[in-house]
Amino acid sequence: VGGPGIVPRGGRQVVTALPARGEVWWCELPEAGRRPVVVLSRDAAIPRLRRALIGPCTTRIRGIPTEVRLEPGDDPVPRVSAVNLDAVESVAIATLVERLGRLGDERMHQICEAIEVAVGCRP
């Protein structure tokens, strides 16, 4: 079955960890394929909705205010990439297939600032 939540195993169900805000996961996106994403949803919403708001990562780095650059070693990503906050979307948590790690507080602060720009709350 894959992904977090309740996974059947040998006639019984095993609860696996849910994603949490600030974590980076491999995600199976229908249009973009498998790519790392950053979970943006507040933790309380994820188990209720069974969905998470995510920011997809891309290796096409444009250096614009709605992106946050991620670096292997500093961040849990396999390659230098950027979180694209112009492409935020809600996905079923079943599409989150493998946890890569958690971003630090400073990186999440940068992401919050980029979201403000992406939605027009800050120029």
Residue ranges and their predicted role:
Residues 1-123:
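Conserved functional hotspots at enzyme active or ligand-binding sites that engage polyanionic ligands
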